[in-house]
Amino acid sequence: KQQTSCKRESFNNIEVIAEYQEVSNSEIVKAAAELVDSGRAGTLSRMEEIIEFAQTMGYKKLGLAYCYGMEQYANAIETLLVVNGFDVSAVSCSVGGLKQSEVNDASCIHKVSCNPLGQADQLNNEEVDLTLVVGICLGHDILLNRSLKMDFTTLVVKDRKFNHAPL
């Protein structure tokens, strides 16, 4: 019996299945399945999954869009990716050194602004294959993701209250 998600489905199954058959989508589905098929689910960390997925997909150049407050972690991630054969472009949220007043005239903060649009432009210009998002603020992550022109995945979500582990 087919599940109906509480009978609230508003999409066409035939069209969705056809989308999965498109080469760019089917390659991702197959690479993702390799990470969990044959009893592998739960055996790899998220970082290990990303490395294996990127290798399977043939990605060579990875982007790292990170919060400057997580620079220590970003450096460790970059090192791990390089050791695993990837070229890495790491871009801090403070790229460009924009003043807060240039980005948000309603803010009372008088420091360098986060610049997710600049991060996206930098990574797009460097033509990375896959971007890992690390600790970008809510809202800024939306702007970043909306502007990236390549595949991307979130490695770390920012959650200041629960030490970046929101669940």
Where are these regions (language model features)?
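Electropositive, gly/pro-rich neighborhoods at or near active sites that engage anionic ligands
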Residues: K1-K61, Y68-G69
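Short, flexible loop segments at the rims of nucleotide/cofactor-binding pockets, characterized by
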Residues: G39-G42, S107-V112, L130-T131
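Gly/Ser/Thr-rich loops at beta-strand to alpha-helix junctions
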Residues: R40-L44, Y66-A74, V134-I142
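Active-site glycine-rich loop that binds ribose-phosphate moieties when present
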Residues: S45, K111-N125, I136-L138
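Short glycine-rich or small-residue beta-strand-to-loop segments that form or flank ligand, phosphate
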Residues: G58-Y66, A90-S92, T131-V133
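Long, charge-dense
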Residues: Y73-D121
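Short Gly/Thr/Asp-enriched flexible loops that form oxyanion-binding sites at enzyme active sites
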Residues: Y73-L80, D141-M150
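Short, flexible loop segments at boundaries between secondary-structure elements
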Residues: K149-L167
